[in-house]
Amino acid sequence: MTELARLKFYATQPHSCSYLPDEQATTLFLDPSQPMDVHVYADLSEMGFRRSGDHLYRPHCQNCNACVPARIPATQFLPSRQQKRIIKRNSDLTVHAAKPCFSEEYFDLYQRYIEQRHADGDMFPPSRDQFSTFLVRDLPFSRFYEFRLDGRLLAVAVTDLLPNGLSAVYTFYEPDEERRSLGRFAILWQIGETLRLGLDAVYLGYWIKNCKKMNYKTQYRPIELLVNQRWVILN
């Protein structure tokens, strides 16, 4: 951790919170001039940091601690009956790991997903520049996991492969395939891939109890939360 002590971090000015509309948020960023080293990234993920584009960040709010880092310990995960049904329902899909890049196929799917699922969010309206800045980064540890049915792209799970686990950066999927629960299936697949790679955990980002879009993460049990700088099992 001595290397981490030499890193520089910067805090943003307070701004409107993307998740809790009545709150002001402050974000702590790793110095953008710092090269994106996978081992530093892994250490920072243990401290609750996430990646967005070229930046590693975590919430740093003065008057709110609602954003709680969450991860799934893969070796302890026990799928529920509903989750087992989701896995079976999607057993006809093939998964392929691709290098992050821009394509019209990716963007068309991303655009439909944002327009139909997140039209009330700060990522609407989607644009090609936004997609590229957010997700298409030339990083050796980043993957686009493509989920296809007979060649048709149904979902993309943008995932970072770290020494300590997989970081689920973002998943977008076909909104018209609601029956498949593709967002949930992507997480279940990432848990399985973590086990296949002999890694420890899937890092899911932030659990926010009072935000419907973010509290789904407790459906995966057991789940660990970073509380007072310690990872603890949520009971």
UniProtKB/Swiss-Prot annotation:
Q: Which UniProt keywords apply?
A: Acyltransferase, Cytoplasm, Transferase
Its annotated compartments are: Cytoplasm
* GO CC terms: cytoplasm
Q: Where does it mainly reside?
A: cytoplasm
**Superkingdom of the source?**
Bacteria
What this protein catalyses is:
N-terminal L-glutamyl-[protein] + L-leucyl-tRNA(Leu) = N-terminal L-leucyl-L-glutamyl-[protein] + tRNA(Leu) + H(+); N-terminal L-aspartyl-[protein] + L-leucyl-tRNA(Leu) = N-terminal L-leucyl-L-aspartyl-[protein] + tRNA(Leu) + H(+)
Q: Is Acyltransferase among the key words of this record?
A: yes
Question: Could you state a single Gene Ontology molecular function term?
Answer: leucyl-tRNA--protein transferase activity
Q: Which InterPro entries match?
A: Acyl_CoA_acyltransferase, Asp_Glu_LeuTrfase, N-end_Aminoacyl_Trfase, N-end_Aminoacyl_Trfase_C, N-end_Aminoacyl_Trfase_N
- Name a single GO biological process: ubiquitin-dependent protein catabolic process via the N-end rule pathway
Q: What Enzyme Commission number does this protein have?
A: 2.3.2.29
Going by the record, the broad EC class of this enzyme is transferase
Q: Which family does it belong to?
A: Belongs to the R-transferase family. Bpt subfamily.
- What HAMAP family does this protein's entry cite? Bpt
* Protein's name in the database: Aspartate/glutamate leucyltransferase
